[in-house]
């Protein structure tokens, strides 16, 4: 109130007082997000002595959020494995489903972390987008940075920027198209936040259900998610040094 933090909730306001309200947008967005259906058992896609991959359902956050009561894959996985250590090296957006990889011992962290930071692994996604893709394949390349918060939920938004951005490279291949939609495969050569979502929307092909980047609200209301799925990952194994997909 009048430039000072108010500590007494019962204090009376005087006429002409200036009131500034602080809003925690992260907590607000988390509270407004739909509550996901929590699976009884997480599906394990791959497991050996060093690595384990889970199939993350859409709607389930990768890790704990500001809403401590909201379920997340990391905590569910720990519980399912009986408290075994899990090293988290990447994440998927809440509404993105698919492959999520963890290390099972700390001694494998450096080897795996370097592959992520140096972009030495390949991550493949399937996306359903609005519109008919004209080119059967191509490469999308730009520098991505934050554009601030957008929409009624004040979600963090990213896009191509002229300065201060990080290089992002996405290859795509058209799999099928019809009824005003296209099914495509995307391969990431970098791992920037919202990279595929931004690159496709900037080409005029927003992911179906992705209201933050241009998909009509009716699609999200109908589907309850955006149509992006991480279907494969190729990584060099920390023990055998062979490629594992």
Residue spans for each PLM region:
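RNA pseudouridine synthases
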Residues: 1-245
């Amino acid at each position: 109130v009048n430039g000072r933090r108010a500590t007494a909730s019962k204090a009376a306001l005087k006429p002409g007082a200036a009131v500034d309200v602080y809003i925690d947008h992260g907590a607000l967005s988390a509270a407004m997000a739909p509550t996901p259906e929590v699976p009884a058992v997480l599906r394990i896609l791959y497991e050996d002595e060093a690595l384990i991959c889970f199939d993350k359902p859409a709607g389930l956050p990768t890790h704990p959020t500001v809403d401590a009561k909201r379920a997340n894959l990391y905590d569910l996985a720990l519980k399912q494995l009986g408290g075994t250590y899990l090293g988290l090296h990447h994440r998927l957006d809440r509404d993105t489903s698919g492959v999520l990889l963890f290390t099972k011992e700390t001694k494998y962290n450096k080897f795996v972390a370097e592959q992520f930071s140096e972009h030495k692994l390949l991550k493949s996604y399937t996306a359903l987008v609005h519109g008919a893709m004209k080119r059967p394949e191509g490469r999308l390349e730009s520098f991505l940075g934050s554009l601030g918060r957008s929409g009624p939920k004040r979600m963090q938004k990213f896009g191509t920027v002229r300065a201060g951005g990080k290089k992002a490279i996405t290859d795509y291949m058209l799999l099928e198209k019809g009824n005003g939609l296209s099914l495509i495969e995307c391969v990431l050569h970098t791992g920037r936040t919202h990279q595929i979502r931004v690159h496709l929307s900037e080409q005029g092909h927003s992911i179906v259900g992705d209201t933050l980047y241009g998909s009509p609200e009716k699609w999200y209301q109908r589907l309850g998610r955006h149509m992006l799925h991480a279907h494969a990952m190729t990584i060099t194994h920390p023990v055998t040094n062979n490629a594992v997909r």
